[in-house]
């Protein structure tokens, strides 16, 4: 008899069923691994699968996480180049793609990443036909559209990480100005993730007190306190971090884990994330942009309709036109 047989008396033969709360991360670069560790630290999955094309790096990352199993509550961590390891995932997070270079706009990346998605998405769909897709790769709004088109999934199951991080950055910077924790600083950034995102100044508040009611110039050029700079800093922040350390990872990883928690626990929290906005705010094309969405186990079930100023709506429509201009040229 083996040590195991001496030690353990089997009571019930377990069938090797599949995981109940499986999450897959596609792409084990800096962003993918930040997502992975953030998800593991929040105990959101009973199985985590990692996929990438670079096999040595992939196996190394898997082993490194497995060696930390004692300190985690996720019993199974697997990886592979073959998408069969992703089978029966509830949530699949796509971080793979060409990385944004210093000074490169997110939109510049697009065709390079479409070609990568043409391989990834059909493989994901084949093994997890009922999953929710969470797209993180940039330019996220266009690639969420690409994932939706290629997957054939209903729109509520294809989600872009969108402005969840932009809004978090905004609330952090607002908190720094006011000396208050970001959780108690409320403000929404909507529209395109990145350079043409739209801050909704009318909704910025602390404890229900509207900052614009206190200071009507808030967010305008006439503002002596230059609150507009806060939004400019949000837009510039990724570029600054890329310039300093070469890429962004931790904040986006935490932001994605925040979304994953809402999905896996069916929390129905409202997040500024990228969804199909055709028919909203006068948008006529199939574009994905960030608006406040009710998120849960089935994906995006509802959208909260914000009361926007005409110039805010105009900015969102302009973003939609820009994105559609790029999307209609894409080669699938």
Swiss-Prot record:
Pathway: Fermentation; pyruvate fermentation to lactate; (S)-lactate from pyruvate: step 1/1
Catalytic residues identified in the record: 193
Documented EC number(s): 1.1.1.27
Enzyme class: oxidoreductase
InterPro entries reported for this sequence: L-lactate/malate_DH, L-lactate_DH, L-lactate_DH_AS, Lactate/malate_DH_C, Lactate/malate_DH_N, Lactate_DH/Glyco_Ohase_4_C, NAD(P)-bd_dom_sf
Record's keyword terms, sorted: Cytoplasm, NAD, Oxidoreductase
Annotated NAD(+) binding sites: 29-57, 99, 138
Entry's Gene Ontology cellular component terms: cytoplasm
Cell compartment(s), UniProt: Cytoplasm
Reactions it catalyzes: (S)-lactate + NAD(+) = pyruvate + NADH + H(+)
Self-association and partners: Homotetramer.
Job of this protein: Interconverts simultaneously and stereospecifically pyruvate and lactate with concomitant interconversion of NADH and NAD(+).
Family: Belongs to the LDH/MDH superfamily. LDH family.
HAMAP family for this protein: Lactate_dehydrog (MF_00488)
Protein name from the UniProt record: L-lactate dehydrogenase A chain
Gene behind the chain: LDHA
């Amino acid at each position: 008899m083996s040590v195991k047989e001496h030690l353990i008396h089997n009571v019930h033969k377990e069938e090797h069923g599949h995981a109940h709360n499986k999450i897959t991360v596609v792409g084990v670069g800096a962003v993918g691994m930040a997502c992975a560790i953030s998800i593991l630290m929040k105990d959101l999955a009973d199985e985590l699968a990692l996929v990438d094309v670079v096999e040595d790096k992939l196996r190394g990352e898997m082993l490194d996480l497995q060696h930390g199993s004692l300190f985690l509550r996720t019993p199974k961590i697997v990886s592979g180049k073959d998408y069969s390891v992703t089978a029966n995932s509830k949530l699949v997070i796509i971080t793979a793609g060409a990385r944004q270079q210093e000074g490169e706009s997110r939109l510049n990346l697009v065709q390079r990443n479409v070609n990568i998605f043409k391989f990834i998405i059909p493989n994901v769909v084949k093994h997890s036909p009922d999953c929710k897709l969470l797209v993180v790769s940039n330019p996220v709004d266009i690639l969420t559209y690409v994932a939706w088109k290629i997957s054939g999934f209903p729109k509520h199951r294809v989600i872009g990480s969108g402005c969840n991080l932009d809004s978090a950055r905004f609330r952090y910077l607002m908190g720094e100005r006011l000396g208050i924790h970001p959780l108690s600083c409320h403000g929404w950034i909507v529209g395109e993730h990145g350079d043409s995102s739209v801050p909704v100044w009318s909704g910025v508040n602390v404890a229900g007190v509207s900052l614009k009611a206190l200071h009507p110039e808030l967010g305008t050029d006439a503002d002596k306190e230059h609150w507009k700079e806060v939004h400019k800093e949000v837009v510039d922040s990724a570029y600054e971090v890329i310039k300093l350390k070469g890429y962004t990872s931790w904040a986006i990883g935490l932001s994605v884990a925040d979304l994953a928690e809402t999905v896996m626990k069916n929390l129905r929290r409202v997040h500024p994330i990228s969804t199909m906005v055709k028919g909203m705010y006068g948008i006529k094309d199939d574009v994905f942009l960030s608006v406040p969405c009710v998120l849960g186990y089935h994906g995006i079930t509802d959208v909260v309709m914000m009361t926007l100023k005409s110039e805010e709506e105009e900015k969102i429509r302009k973003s939609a036109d820009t994105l559609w201009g790029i999307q209609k040229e894409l080669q699938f």
